Amino acid sequence: MARLAGVDLPREKRMEIALTYIYGIGRTRSKEILRATDISFDVRPKDLDDDQLAKLREALENYRLEGDLRREVQADIRRKIEIGCYQGLRHRRHLPVHGQRTKTNARTRKGPKKTVAGKKKAGKK
């Protein structure tokens, strides 16, 4: 099993896809890394030899990945909250940050609906 950046890559997937299992690497960056290391997109992680794995590890050192990237993102969010900018306020209130509508939708960010009782009808006497 190939292990890169602390992540076990799936053995049967194409290398182009397998690299995307690492947090911080998407399809574009995966292709970029494979081109730089002269490794085929179609090779499977189980078929990589030690030289190719060493090249990949060396190439991955140039990027912030996994825990470092997660910490950096969290630090950026904390900084925005502390300085009190608009994005920080939206994070603090658990609302969408990038200008999306909130009258309807935004349920992922806001959580489940909080049901509010309607006005009761007056009974006849």
Curated annotation (Swiss-Prot):
Region of interest: Disordered: 92-125
Keywords: Ribonucleoprotein, Ribosomal protein, RNA-binding, rRNA-binding, tRNA-binding
The keyword Calcium is annotated on this UniProt entry: no
A GO term for molecular function: tRNA binding
Pfam families from the UniProt entry: Ribosomal_S13
GO cellular component, one term: small ribosomal subunit
PROSITE patterns assigned: RIBOSOMAL_S13_1, RIBOSOMAL_S13_2
GO BP terms, alphabetized: translation
SUPFAM superfamilies assigned to the protein according to its UniProt record, in alphabetical order: S13-like H2TH domain
Record-linked HAMAP family: Ribosomal_uS13
Function comment: Located at the top of the head of the 30S subunit, it contacts several helices of the 16S rRNA. In the 70S ribosome it contacts the 23S rRNA (bridge B1a) and protein L5 of the 50S subunit (bridge B1b), connecting the 2 subunits; these bridges are implicated in subunit movement. Contacts the tRNAs in the A and P-sites.
Family: Belongs to the universal ribosomal protein uS13 family.
Subunit-level organization: Part of the 30S ribosomal subunit. Forms a loose heterodimer with protein S19. Forms two bridges to the 50S subunit in the 70S ribosome.
PANTHER family from the UniProt entry: 30S RIBOSOMAL PROTEIN S13/40S RIBOSOMAL PROTEIN S18, SMALL RIBOSOMAL SUBUNIT PROTEIN US13M
Protein name, as recorded: Small ribosomal subunit protein uS13
Source organism of the structure: Saccharopolyspora erythraea (strain ATCC 11635 / DSM 40517 / JCM 4748 / NBRC 13426 / NCIMB 8594 / NRRL 2338)
Lineage: Bacteria, Bacillati, Actinomycetota, Actinomycetes, Pseudonocardiales
Record gene name: rpsM
